[in-house]
Amino acid sequence: PLHIYSISQACQNALMCTNYQIPNRERLTLHYGDLPHGEWREVMSPLYRGLFLRANDGGQELVVGQWGMIPPRSTSSVPTGKDGKRLSTFNARREGMARSWTYGEPWRRGQRCIIPAESYVEPYWGTGRHIPWRFARAGGAPWGLAGLWSEWIDPSTGELLPNYTMLTQNCDAVPVLNLMHRPDPKRP
């Protein structure tokens, strides 16, 4: 079962589908085991440090990383394209993954991950204007959202920065999710 909550008008412009909430430390430990060292946010927006779960040496590990995949040739942790313009890489459409210069290599290498989330927010457009809706599991257990991870090395400092993106796909066949996002005749 699913709980859907309408978000207050005050939050309307800030949240949209660029927001999710990570479970608190106690719930993370209960559901995922040992916590990583480092700091992360519980209320997530793009480019914040969050958590993802990946396979490691026959097991799994929670990793602190930046939400927003950084292309390999980017000169900054703010994702940029070949032309130097800022990219939105926090969500990646599954349908185009293999052909993407940002996501293609991690996809082919099988760098899938699970993103722990207490809830996530999507824009409802049934009224003709966006109204943020928060989705959470009815039983209160966290979601495990599909993701893809990579590691980027800062060319100026040599620091290794894990990063990740949330996988999305067309949901027109799912009645509730079909109501989300502004209708776009150019996209399936």
Go through the PLM ranges and name each one.
Residues 2-188:
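Short linear sequence motif anchored by a di-proline
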